[in-house]
Amino acid sequence: TTERAKIAPILTSEQAFDDQTFAKPQEARVTHLDLDLVMDFDAKSIGGTAILDVLATEGANEIVLDSNGLRISAVTDEAGNALEFNLGETVEGKGEPLTIQLPAQKLERPAGLAEGELAATHRIAVEYLSAPEAEALQWLSPEQTAGGEHPFLFSQGQAINNRTWIPTQDSPGIRQTWEATVSAPEPLNVVMSGVVQGDPEAVDGNRRDFRFEMNHPVPPYLIAIAAGNIEFRE
């Protein structure tokens, strides 16, 4: 028998190029995304913090993410220290490059990794808010739903629309694992394209937190969310 080859994401190859992303994955790429978000139906926005694990090459001092209409309020390192960032000019149909200075301090290499196995070198946190006109998010009023009592939200990230509500490297070749905690007003339920982690947890302000996890690296456009008067049946 032959050992099954490990296939790396296409954009780790120098020959591959995606002209619909601002990212430079040969220098620094996102490997994991941890979202802590609050859903606001009145403002038609999702906002909070995206914590990104980054694998950077030796000598790389910045990472470029994709954004489209995101309102970036702060970027910090793991210790909460501010990091320099710049939101570039908008390119029609593509959005803006979000360039972030990487922390000087690198993450410790986890114990038990095999020789040659790669691990994240940096961790950064981006505080942000999506715009009401975010193309990936469809906000429906109660009158637009079958029940007529509660609003409804669903996302459509393909092909490059998730950058309108998630600051990451929005390219199908830059696959990422992810996890998310999403706060929504009662009695709405939240679903995502990941594995549910426990029951919803009640929090202040008549809201509940929902948790999800995806341990298999996926293209960013496959991160999906919906919320509304959703029922679960066996």
Positions of the model-derived regions?
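Acidic/His-enriched low-complexity segments
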Residues: 1-234
